[in-house]
From Swiss-Prot:
The lineage of its organism: Bacteria, Pseudomonadati, Pseudomonadota, Gammaproteobacteria, Enterobacterales. The gene is yieL. InterPro entries: AB_hydrolase_fold, Esterase-like, Glyco_hydro_13_N, Ig-like_fold, Ig_E-set, Mycobacterial_A85_antigen. GO terms for molecular function: acyltransferase activity, transferring groups other than amino-acyl groups; hydrolase activity, hydrolyzing O-glycosyl compounds. Pfam families: CBM_48, Esterase. Transmembrane segments: none annotated. Gene3D superfamilies: alpha/beta hydrolase, Immunoglobulins. This is Uncharacterized protein YieL.
């Protein structure tokens, strides 16, 4: 007999409630006399953050805030109620990503609703107010989730479209930015972690950007034989990235751009179309942007994988025609954190090649930063302020 069924039967026979018998096999819970605020993470009045984690049986708990490097690991202390905590110094306004290390096991914060919506969710987020990432009292655009059939991939797909406040589809056609997220992320990552809607709302309210649409496809195609989780990390550059980039490129040109052009009142000229992405999405932007140079007037890669480590014949051929690139692109932006250990060599190689071939580009290096959102959010905000002007 199943052990749980046997225990339940015994409990009922003994006059013990079935509810108690099931609960006895559940993890510990905070005492009902403790207010919830005493065992969940919170932003304090002075913009410090108190991280909390309820784990009365744990021996060691720490919180890792930001990129998982030694300086960002903070030991926590346990109180009599079994709540581990650590309070930060006063923080600047920003969105902070974090996770807990509980006796060697990585854990999200179960006391908050804000997790990073990756393909495998393994970190949480907390917003400290006081930056352009806030949801301010300004006119807000709309965020539309579109489910569609991709003929290129022969599957049902989803993408997100941000439209500016008051957009009705009437009047002059608007330009479009197509933005690709990074490896392991989803379209929601660009929205929730990247804060694209808030950035666009706030910059538009300040008159710093032109009205435009932002289209956020899923960088991962999940096509047959191109499932990210099927590849060990050592095979990503050699096998996965090239295969996925070609599939995503077909989807962009054959499905996504035609669908957006049909469903929304948007410009169809190259100067009215921008393409950008971060990390793996930066590689996607480079591949599609260079292979279809005539279709885009603006291009950006933020800490992107490049052909320095992942060759692409189309990109290589286009980079050998500097005059065509300089004539076609109104702006080509390349961004990286100077401590980037993931794609730093990629960007360095691309930068050298662009300089040697005298290809025009804007270059921004963020000091002291790694492969992280503290590079990509400011880079995104800076790039959209250049567009369509």
């Amino acid at each position: 007999m199943n052990i749980k069924i046997a225990a339940l039967t015994l409990a009922i026979a003994s006059g013990i409630s079935a509810q108690w018998a099931i609960a006895a096999d559940m993890p510990a819970s905070p005492a009902p006399t403790i207010p919830v605020k005493q065992y969940v993470t919170q932003v304090n009045a002075d913009n410090s953050v108190t991280f909390r984690y309820f784990a009365p049986g744990a021996k060691n708990v720490s919180v890792v805030v930001g990129v998982p490097v030694p300086d960002n690991i903070h030991p926590m202390t346990k109180d009599e109620a079994g709540v581990w905590s650590w309070r930060t110094p006063i923080l600047k306004g920003n969105l902070y990503e974090y996770f807990f290390n509980v006796d060697g096991v990585r854990s999200i914060d179960t006391g908050t609703a804000m997790t990073n919506p990756q393909r495998q969710v393994n970190s949480s987020m907390i917003l400290v107010p006081g930056s352009y990432l806030d949801t301010r009292s300004v006119a807000h655009g709309d965020l539309i989730a579109i489910t569609y059939h991709s003929n290129a991939l022969q599957s049902e797909r989803q993408m997100y479209v941000w439209t500016p406040p008051g957009y009705t589809g009437m009047g002059e056609p608007l330009p479009v930015l197509y933005f690709y997220h990074g490896f392991g992320d989803t379209g929601r990552s660009a929205i929730d972690q990247g804060r694209i809607p808030q950035i666009m709302d706030n910059l538009l309210a300040e008159g710093k950007i032109k009205p435009m649409l932002v289209v956020i496809p899923d960088t991962e195609t999940d096509a047959k034989g191109i499932i990210p989780e099927d590849f060990v990390p050592q095979e990503r550059r050699k096998v996965f990235y090239p295969l996925n980039a070609k599939a995503a490129d077909r989807e962009l040109m054959n499905d996504i751009i035609p669908l957006i052009s049909k469903r929304f009142n948007v410009r169809k000229d190259a100067d009215g179309r921008a393409l950008a992405g971060l990390s793996q999405g930066g590689y996607q932007a480079l591949v599609s942007g260079m292979n279809h140079l005539e279709s885009f007037g603006w291009l950006a890669t933020f800490s992107g994988v490049t052909t320095t480590t992942v060759p692409d014949e189309g990109v290589a051929a286009r980079l050998n025609d500097p005059a065509a690139i300089n004539q076609q692109l109104r702006n080509f932006t390349v961004v990286v954190g100077d401590k980037d250990v993931v794609t730093g060599k990629d960007i360095a190689g691309l930068k050298t090649e662009l300089e040697q071939k005298k290809i025009n580009f804007d270059y921004q290096e963020y000091p002291g930063l790694n492969h992280e959102m503290d590079v990509w959010r400011p880079a995104y905000a800076a790039f959209v302020q250049k567009l369509f002007k």
